[in-house]
């Protein structure tokens, strides 16, 4: 009652400050809300075994990382900072994570020295795992392999087997020796699948450049044993990666990983190249690899004997059980990798580099990786070279997304900024972008504001139109009323008033109208008589 279960997700959320510090060391920035979304909702859908509460298992983390870094529409660039941070926590766990991480197993030497003489110690009975040994009836005289003290059982397929007990004293009649021989002869030989499982489980040693997951391994009899590649491995590598012509960088990285982890022989390398490359691509790679052979002076050589000795085209007689043979194989793999890198370079084409632009939802870190890959593929320059940092930085600024590029150009003291500083600033700008929900909400709000403003403007224009009509109608009515008043005043016009000494007839002053000399003086004519009609008329 009252107890809570601690999970990797809840543990990282409780120590979120440390998580942000680890993310900052990886030149990325993470947000708690997105981490809570990706871990339980997004990553379990990748079908790689990711639990909803998270895990610190590096195998599962690397599988999720491969899904996140997938090219094209299948990738998830917005999740890159979060899976990179999670990987860093699992790879170098802080103190609060160590109790929840399974302890790393001690690794055996990758290139063991073969025994030169008879050993005084009794050889181990088998190099197999207990799960693969046949069921043998235990003998009371022999100590048990697993203790009965109630301790936790190991994973029989993925963990190293426990040490066998010391050999008891042999019986005088030699029966014990015969039983020992029978016990050893009944154990089957190691299988390739067991080596693959153990190779995937055990990480490489920090101070070694080789891995335990190679086809050459030390068997139970003290001899190196060889298992070739499985057909399923070759099939998956070919179908889950682009061709060499389409993306030489990615396929080169895959082959480099295989050469490092599996330590293949000369025949394995030919099988690998024949599966992943076309005939023309393979010939080009072999030619470039032979060009990379160096002589005793450290410079490239064209002497046929030295070239054929270091990188033969026909099957050599290298014995991988001897140090000399293993050294030949190491040099051959290094030259093969150099040939892949040189053959993957295309003719110089800066237009291809300028055509690499940041996608709308692509993180700056993923965009920088694509930009560097374009430099490696289409130019003779190494983007990791310090002398090319300025060119890569300028391309990163100019070819970033418009909103990120504008803000990067306005940074203070831009000339002193390193490429890492620019990526850090770009990540901050990228993470401050709106989420799709916030962007939709902003668009909806802006649409409503525009509609409201448009309605207000329409109402204002309508009111202005009404006022203009009213003014025009007022002017028209005023004109009509004024005209009517003038007409009415014109019909009732009175005679002008006369002065006291002014004539009403001639309008001259000094006399009146009866004395006006201009007025005619003749007798008046008789007035016409008005006749009245009677009823008889």
From Swiss-Prot:
GO BP, one example? viral budding via host ESCRT complex
- Residues with site note (Cleavage): 129-130, 214-215, 477-478
Per the annotation, the residue ranges of the short sequence motif PPXY motif are: 161-164
Q: Where is this region: Disordered?
A: 112-217, 433-537
Coiled-coil residues: 437-477
- Which GO MF term does the entry hold, naming one? RNA binding
Entries under InterPro entries matching the protein: G_retro_matrix (IPR000840), G_retro_matrix_sf (IPR036946), Gag_p12 (IPR002079), Gag_P30 (IPR003036), Retrov_capsid_N (IPR008919), Retroviral_Gag-Pol_poly (IPR050462), Retrovr_matrix (IPR010999), Znf_CCHC (IPR001878)
Which residue stretches are annotated zinc finger (CCHC-type)? Answer: 501-518
Give me the ranges of the annotated region Interaction with host UBE2I.
Answer: 429-434
Annotated motif PTAP/PSAP motif, positions: 109-112
What are the entry keywords? Capsid protein, Coiled coil, Host cell membrane, Host cytoplasm, Host endosome, Host membrane, Host-virus interaction, Lipoprotein, Membrane, Metal-binding, Myristate, Phosphoprotein, RNA-binding, Ubl conjugation, Viral budding, Viral budding via the host ESCRT complexes, Viral matrix protein, Viral nucleoprotein, Viral release from host cell, Virion, Zinc, Zinc-finger
One Pfam family name from the record? Answer: Gag_p30
Return the annotated region ranges for Interaction with host PIAS4.
344-392
Annotated motif LYPX(n)L motif: location in the chain?
128-132
Q: Which residues carry this modification: Phosphoserine?
A: 191
What residues show lipidation of type N-myristoyl glycine? 2
Q: Which GO terms describe its cellular component?
A: host cell plasma membrane; host multivesicular body; membrane; viral nucleocapsid
Annotated Basic and acidic residues bias: 433-474, 485-518
Explain the post-translational modification: RNA-binding phosphoprotein p12 is phosphorylated on serine residues.
Q: What is this protein called?
A: Gag polyprotein
Q: Which organism is it from?
A: Radiation murine leukemia virus
**What taxonomic lineage is listed for the species of origin?**
Viruses, Riboviria, Pararnavirae, Artverviricota, Revtraviricetes
What gene name is given for the protein in this entry? gag
